[in-house]
């Protein structure tokens, strides 16, 4: 049975966001999948002048620019036949993306690694980093590659976070020829162990799988080195956040890999408990499903 995936694509129209858009467009999405495109207006006083209409001009320009960016992404994704909706939100970017992801039941949030607008950062964009560290949903951070991943590195231990990563990969729309290298990490003594490789072979049976084992030591360096060795174009690992985790796949490790990887990184989060979501004043809904 074909898994149905719901993606949320956060864009600011920057070069980094365009790379992420090309990556998402290249994936073999079906008409059963869904993508929510989310943009957040960025307001600038440049050119408004000191006139009574200044605030209105500022708001209108920001909204128009955000809609144009979002509509361009929506049109690009729609050419592949996948259902796409557009949502323009006000407020802090990370909060807006997480709010929409919860409301739309998104499986994965897709962003560029860095950009020229609200995603700008020194090495890794501030929004991408904050989502991977603190958000409750899984996050795919795309770097230079603009085509669908063909060689995945899946880092696992015996934890719930690793299980979330394996399950997410099994549901992802990947090319049929994609190969998966599974890197077993030394399990934490406190991990809730499960027969990891048996489950991997069952859930990922549609793809060629190669199993490798990491030695004790600096695990982030081991993951990064293995990713380079196998020519990975996507690294997948689980994480519960910066302050929690039942195994070695804790937030600090995911953060190191995300910051230093040469390729795209998918940080999988365990499913969260159901929660009631309402729009707050800081994240007012402007438009949806245009």
Q: Where do the protein language model's features map onto the residues?
A:
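Glycine-rich, Arg-bearing micro-motifs that act as flexible, cationic patches
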Residues: 111-130, 149, 237-260, 270-276, ...
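N-terminal membrane-insertion helices
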Residues: 66-70, 74, 193, 197
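Small/aliphatic-rich secondary-structure junction motif
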Residues: 2-54, 80, 147-213, 232-234, ...
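Short, structured interface segments
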Residues: 125-145, 263-268
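Aromatic/hydrophobic pocket-lining residues that form π-stacking "cages" and hydrophobic walls in ligand
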Residues: 24, 73, 97, 131, ...
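Helix-enriched interaction subdomains in cytosolic or periplasmic regions
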Residues: 2-3, 9, 103-136
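Structural alpha-helical scaffold elements that stabilize or flank donor/cofactor-binding regions
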Residues: 100-102, 131, 145, 228, ...
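Structural beta-alpha unit
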Residues: 1-3, 26, 56-60, 64, ...
């Amino acid at each position: 049975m074909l898994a149905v995936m719901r993606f949320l694509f956060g864009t600011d129209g920057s070069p980094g966001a365009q790379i992420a858009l090309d990556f998402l467009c290249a994936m073999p999405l079906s008409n059963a999948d869904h993508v929510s495109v989310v943009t957040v207006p960025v307001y600038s006083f440049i050119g408004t002048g000191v006139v009574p209409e200044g605030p209105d001009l500022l708001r209108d320009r920001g909204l128009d620019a955000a809609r144009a960016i979002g509509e361009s992404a929506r049109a690009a994704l729609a050419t592949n036949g996948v259902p796409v909706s557009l949502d323009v939100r006000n407020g802090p970017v990370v909060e807006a993306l997480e709010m929409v992801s919860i409301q739309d039941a998104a499986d994965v949030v897709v962003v560029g690694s860095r950009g020229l607008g609200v995603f700008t950062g020194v090495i890794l964009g501030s929004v991408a980093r904050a989502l991977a560290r603190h958000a409750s949903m899984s996050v795919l951070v795309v770097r230079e590659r603009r085509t669908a991943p063909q060689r995945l590195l899946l880092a696992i231990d015996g934890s719930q976070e690793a299980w979330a990563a394996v399950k997410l990969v099994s549901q992802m729309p990947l090319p049929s020829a994609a190969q998966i290298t599974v890197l077993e990490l030394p399990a934490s003594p406190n991990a809730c162990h499960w027969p990891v490789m048996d489950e991997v072979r069952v859930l990922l049976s549609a793809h060629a799988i190669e199993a490798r084992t990491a030695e004790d030591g600096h695990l982030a360096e081991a993951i990064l080195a293995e990713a380079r060795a196998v020519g990975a174009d996507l690294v997948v690992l689980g994480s519960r956040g910066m302050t929690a985790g039942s195994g070695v796949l804790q937030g600090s490790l995911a953060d190191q890999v995300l910051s230093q990887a040469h390729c795209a990184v998918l940080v999988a989060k365990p499913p969260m408990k159901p929660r009631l979501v309402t729009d707050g004043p800081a994240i007012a809904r402007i438009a949806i499903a245009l």
